[in-house]
Structure formats: structure tokens, C-alpha cells
């Protein structure tokens, strides 16, 4: 009697497993009824995510592998993270991405605070500082300098160039003039700005085109 009950219980469990497998993998009950996308900053970037996600209405939810879909989407350089969820009750699949936020253009490409360089489909409309550098470390140093400058100063700057983190220079508008400022490294920013303003206030410097603040205690004007 015991063995008979055991066989019946085993058979019922097997039937249950097979039924669930069928329902999840082949039945039309648990299928994707809608797919939503969020987080992509432009229409073109959303289309790129949608193409790589490759999720179709009517597709079995059990066959939508979150890890594989996320891996495909993460091949887009501008993607920072991906989150995918499946609602087994209403059949909704949600694909949410977090885009990298650019803080500057680096050698013609967008770059975020982690130093990741990328291009965004559809472009980026907000104005960003333009940085040219030999390597990422130097580029990040130039960007950090820009971000530490007072707004009334930074809004007049352009074309940041960094040969190294210790050798940063840029252009700045002063009325109708454009001056080349050799800044050096990102240290002593407040003091360098004070020296810069003091130099411009001198009548004999009314026609200078270049200021070297590498050593703010011994500035050079030309």
C-alpha cells in the first residue's frame, strides 16, 4: 500500500512538473502581451535598445532570458545599467536602461565621470566643455578643472587641452579678445583666478594674448 501511494504521489508530481513546463514554455497563457522601454535619452537610442532586446509580442515569458537580453543591450557603450522585469500576471515586459551622463566631449566623443567614452545615437543637445587630451587621465583632470571653476569664469572658456594632468591650458574670452591661459595643474584654482584678475586689471596688460599661471606666484604674460 505504501509503495502504491508513493508511486501515485511521484506520478502526480511528474504530471504537475510537465504541466508547468508546458504552461511556461509552450502555452499561449504566459506570453509577452506588451513591452515597454524607458531610460533611453533619445528616440534613436531607444530604437537601438529595442533592436538589441529583440522581444516580440506573443513570445513566451519563460523564453525571455533576462541575463541574455541585458548582455546584448550592454554592448551599447552609452549604457550604464539594464533592468528587465516580467509580469507573469498581465504579461508585461519592462526594459529599463540607465544611460551614461556625459560631462564633456573628449577628443570628439562624449565622456562620463568614470572616463568612459561613447557616442549617443541621436546626439546630445546640452552644451558641454570640449576637451582634447593625450589620454583619459589627462582628459579627466581637465574636466575636473573645468567643473571647479566659478561659473562666471567657466562660461567664457573653451577648447581645454591637456598634454598631461600637470599641463592644462584653455582659451577664455575677455571682451573682444581671446586669451590663451596656461593653467598647469588643477591645484590652487582660487588663487590662480585671483592672480589672473589682478593681471588683467593692469593697464600694461591691455593687449596681452597669453597668461601662464603654471606657477601663480611667478606668472608670465605675453
PLM regions with names:
Residues 1-36, 43-60, 67-71, 75, ...:
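Charged, solvent-exposed interaction patches on well-folded alpha/beta domains
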Amino acid at each position: 500500500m505504501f509503495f502504491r501511494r508513493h508511486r501515485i504521489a511521484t506520478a502526480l508530481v511528474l504530471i504537475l512538473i510537465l504541466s508547468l513546463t508546458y504552461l511556461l514554455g509552450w502555452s499561449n497563457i504566459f506570453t509577452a502581451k506588451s513591452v515597454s522601454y524607458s531610460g533611453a535619452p533619445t528616440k534613436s537610442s531607444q530604437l537601438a535598445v529595442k533592436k538589441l532586446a529583440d522581444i516580440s509580442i506573443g513570445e513566451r515569458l519563460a523564453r525571455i532570458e533576462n541575463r541574455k537580453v541585458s548582455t546584448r543591450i550592454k554592448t551599447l557603450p552609452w549604457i550604464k545599467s539594464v533592468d528587465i522585469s516580467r509580469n507573469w500576471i498581465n504579461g508585461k515586459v519592462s526594459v529599463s536602461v540607465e544611460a551614461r551622463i556625459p560631462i564633456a566631449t573628449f577628443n570628439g566623443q562624449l565622456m562620463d565621470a568614470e572616463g568612459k567614452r561613447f557616442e549617443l545615437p541621436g546626439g546630445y543637445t546640452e552644451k558641454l566643455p570640449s576637451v582634447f587630451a593625450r589620454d583619459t587621465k589627462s582628459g579627466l583632470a581637465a574636466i575636473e578643472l573645468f567643473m571647479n571653476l566659478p561659473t562666471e569664469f567657466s562660461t567664457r572658456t573653451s577648447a581645454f587641452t591637456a598634454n598631461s594632468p600637470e599641463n592644462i591650458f584653455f582659451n577664455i574670452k575677455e571682451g573682444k579678445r581671446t586669451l590663451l591661459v596656461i593653467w598647469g595643474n588643477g591645484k590652487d584654482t582660487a588663487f590662480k583666478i585671483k592672480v589672473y584678475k589682478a593681471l588683467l586689471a593692469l593697464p600694461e596688460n591691455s593687449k596681452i594674448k597669453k597668461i601662464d599661471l603654471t606657477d601663480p606666484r611667478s606668472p608670465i604674460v605675453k
